[in-house]
Amino acid sequence: MRFKYAFLLLTFCVIILSCTDKKPVSQAQESSVQQEDNVPVKKVDSVKVAKTQPLTYKILVPFNYRLCNPDTIINRNWVELYKDGKDYYVGKARYGIEMREDLCSSTIPTYLAEKRNTILFVNQLPIKKGKVKIADIAFSDSTYLEPGSVRNFTFAGKHYKLEAKAQGESQLKNYTLLLNGERIVREARVDAASFALLFAGDLDGDGKLDLVLSLPTDYEELRVALFLSSCAPPNLQMGKAAEIVDDFSC
């Protein structure tokens, strides 16, 4: 799948870590933006700050990993965000490690299997275990944020507008997500893929909005990111706390 994945295979899976002072396992800079768009945004936004912010949260999702072995990353001290009925909870991570055949891979990938309806595995969260507060919006792996789409919702009495913009059709340029006019995501190029909203609610216990987003830059790429309000730079709503990237190309 082109030169991007040849590079990824050399660097194993990419786990971008969060805003605490622990040392990260590995870091990957957010892909550079080569073209400016016409979206009116603040001069300082979380996209620019994420390039220099040290990151030390770690996340994984249920997936058949090719580029790393999740068994060497996750352990029983991790927690998970999971869905039970219409409610969402944070609890002790329950998972399994399996070897599953992949017809598109020359090696046997390692599958991280969930025991519940897991959205995200995280090495740490400041929130207490139990039911978490969520925004009044339906979200799942099919809640796509296609260019031109707008999601309006409220959380903790505050109204939010999550808007997606991009240029082009199949090959999108400057794919951008705006939260109340503040740019939180921008990718210079996205090939035949769409972003998606996986979760919106409070994951760090400060009563403010946090997000889990699917942000693939290619239709054969896994890329999920955690955004926390407690990682927000001054005067911004949130910052990227962690990201996981892997590949399922043929």
Spans of features found by a protein language model:
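Beta-propeller blade termini
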Residues: S149-R151, F195-L203
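Acidic/hydrophobic-patterned starts of short beta strands in beta-sheet-rich repeat architectures
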Residues: L162, G205-L215
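Sec-dependent N-terminal signal peptides
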Residues: Y5-V14
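Beta-propeller blade repeat segments, especially FG-GAP/WD-type strand-to-loop junctions
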Residues: E221-A241
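Repeat-based blade/solenoid architectures
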Residues: L145, E187-L197, V245-C250
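Bacterial signal peptide processing site
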Residues: T20-K22
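Terminal, intrinsically disordered low-complexity segments enriched in charged/polar
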Residues: S26, E30-N180
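C-terminal motif of bacterial Sec signal peptides marking the signal peptidase cleavage site
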Residues: I16-S18
